[in-house]
Amino acid sequence: MDTPEKSETQIGTPVSKLKVEDSPVFSYICNLSPIKTIKPIPITCPLSSLNYASPPSVFTSPHAVSHKESRFRSQKDVSASKEVGEEEALVGSEPEQSYKNDCNTPRVTNDVKDNGCGKDLQVMMDNVKKKSDTPDWETLIAATTELIYGSPRESEAFSCLLKKTSNSEARLRGSITATSVAVTNTDVVNNESESVDALSILHRGVRRRCLDFEVKGNNQQTLGESSSSCVVPSIGLHLNTIAMSSKDKNVANEYSFSGNIKVGVQSSLTPVLHSQHDIVRENESGKDSGQIIEVVPKSLASVDLTPISPKKKRRKSEQSGEGDSSCKRCNCKKSKCLKLYCECFAAGFYCIEPCSCINCFNKPIHKDVVLATRKQIESRNPLAFAPKVIRNSDSIIEVGEDASKTPASARHKRGCNCKKSNCLKKYCECYQGGVGCSINCRCEGCKNAFGRKDGSLFEQDEENETSGTPGTKKTQQNVELFKPAAPPSTPIPFRQPLAQLPISSNNRLLPPQSHFHHGAIGSSSSGIYNIRKPDMSLLSHSRIETITEDIDDMSENLIHSPITTLSPNSKRVSLSHLDSPESTPWRRNGGGRNLIRSFPTFPSLTPHH
């Protein structure tokens, strides 16, 4: 910093300056040189023009703004002229009254341009003088208070907030669980002047904080830009300015004690729903865009508010109308809907609107034609219009039919004729009707999920019918009696082709050991066999009923009968069939004929035979 030129008064009085330098006060100040004497400088820095922005137009009129700007410039000049006046007062060139006049009037600006700042020594003298010269500083602060908005008291600035919080507590005591800081339109109309006063007081307090923390022009907002009608509680320092800048978004904070909160951006003012009370709040500024937090009750949480398209409505109506008596929606092109492959005609219904057929005659208008065609088809096939699936609960299970599958009486009576689809396509009548294939079906490689047709089993039945051998339709379930310690038998495949067994003269089977690898286990020493489970191919020749009994019950009878055990463990035995019923007194009632051939007793070894 260059040394400013001295004024004429300073040049003209060098003797008085030397007296000041030789004074004991000057020597005392020189000894205190390590002490930083720039303490009052921060007080004068906020008085610069950079720290002051033009006040908002809502608080002042244009005349007041121009007046304050002129006072602001004069105060800057007064601070500079004060230093010059103090310097001249030390040398005794000017009386002290001229300095007081400079503080009150801006007419000393011409001297400031000529003089500027004094030397460092003179600045130190000024600091000492300023500490003792309190009346002048009081006048300076009194003059600048008009530029600085008065700092509000905390109770005054937040009176609106305290009043609103007390109201919200009263509403909570009244069992309303959702409260809001925002007010309704009626509250805005009644308390309009109160909210404006609170905002103006808060604005003055923020402007004062900007002086302390050097926030330059960040809070130039008008009353229309503010989004709330109540003072937002501050967090200290100059961060209130950040809290007040809401980026032109209207935020309505909803405090709720329930967990169902739905946050979304809405384009219009929407009511806030609650389970107990319906509280409707609208934004004060009236803008269309804004963020609104609304509390959705639990009863409305699971409601699907998405609009349903016309296509979905049409599908739902069609599905609701479908049933046994509804149209099948055929797509006939050339048959005029008078053939059996027309689903509507085959089911006995007329074609209606959902059908996409062309040149249709299956309508009430052509009733005579439809009836004539039906009679003609029934004359050729009486079961043409019969139901595809007939379910009868009183039916008897047919031969070789598994009870877990679909009963044969409920299967398709006409039968399918599938060749390559394995009865897994919808054009298979059995699969389409939801039933298994039956004997009447002529399908190949059947894999119907509702019930398969076993080709090997039914082919043997057909051969038996052609050979004239009577077949049985009922079988008695075999019963095997085991010891408690006997392990379960190993399951054997049931449906496998077997060789034709030889038949004796008395229509009894003579099965060799090699032919009983399925269902029979034999002993090579005696040739007596035990059939565990008869094969279905044996049922076509004769009725077979096997009887097995516990070894403990038959221990005495087994001594006189030719019985051979089947295994070393002696767990199963087979009884031979004797020619005379008297020789088997141990046989129980209801027992069937045995398949095993009886052998004569061994000759005695006595010499007289």
Curated annotation (Swiss-Prot):
Residue ranges with Polar residues bias: 466-477
Gene Ontology cellular component list: nucleus
Keyword Zinc: yes
Pfam name, any one: TCR
Region annotation Disordered: where it falls in the sequence: 69-102, 307-328, 457-477, 569-609
Tissue: Ubiquitous but expressed mostly in flowers and at significant levels in leaves. Detected with highest levels in developing ovules and microspores, and in petals.
Amino acid composition bias (Basic and acidic residues), ranges on this chain: 69-84
GO terms classed as biological process: stomatal complex patterning; stomatal lineage progression
Example GO molecular function: metal ion binding
Localisation: Nucleus
Residue span(s) of domain CRC: 326-451
Domain of life: Eukaryota
Disruption phenotype: No visible phenotype.
Family: Belongs to the lin-54 family.
Entry protein name: Protein tesmin/TSO1-like CXC 3
Organism: Arabidopsis thaliana (Mouse-ear cress)
Lineage per the UniProt record: Eukaryota, Viridiplantae, Streptophyta, Embryophyta, Tracheophyta
Gene: TCX3
